[in-house]
């Protein structure tokens, strides 16, 4: 009985290893670039060299923007606000999930404290 379990387990390991190597080969083939793609990549690098002298900057928080890409920081978004009947887009730091969780905990604790009084 134990021998049968060992044989089945070893066969399952062999199948798992074989299937993972096939998946790695498929992934490697998908990642290979064609000649046209590498030529266009080379042209793009030449364009970057030409425009490399231009300074690239980002918009700081609470200044006007058009796209999320223009704002500084990973968690900064270009969010729309309505002021005096017209829309203004400003860069705002959303802070990510951790900040939202901590804010939720802080609100919960303050509500519990206010209920105790």
Swiss-Prot record:
Expression by tissue: Expressed by the venom gland.
CC per GO annotation: extracellular region
Molecular function in Gene Ontology: ion channel regulator activity; toxin activity
Compartment(s): Secreted
Disulfide cysteine pairs (residue numbers): 58-72, 65-78, 69-115, 71-91
Keywords of the record: Disulfide bond, Ion channel impairing toxin, Knottin, Secreted, Signal, Toxin
Keyword Signal: yes
Domain of life according to the entry: Eukaryota
Purpose of the protein: Putative ion channel inhibitor.
Family: Belongs to the neurotoxin 03 (Tx2) family. 02 subfamily. HNTX-XV sub-subfamily.
Protein name (database record): Hainantoxin-XV-3
Organism: Cyriopagopus hainanus (Chinese bird spider)
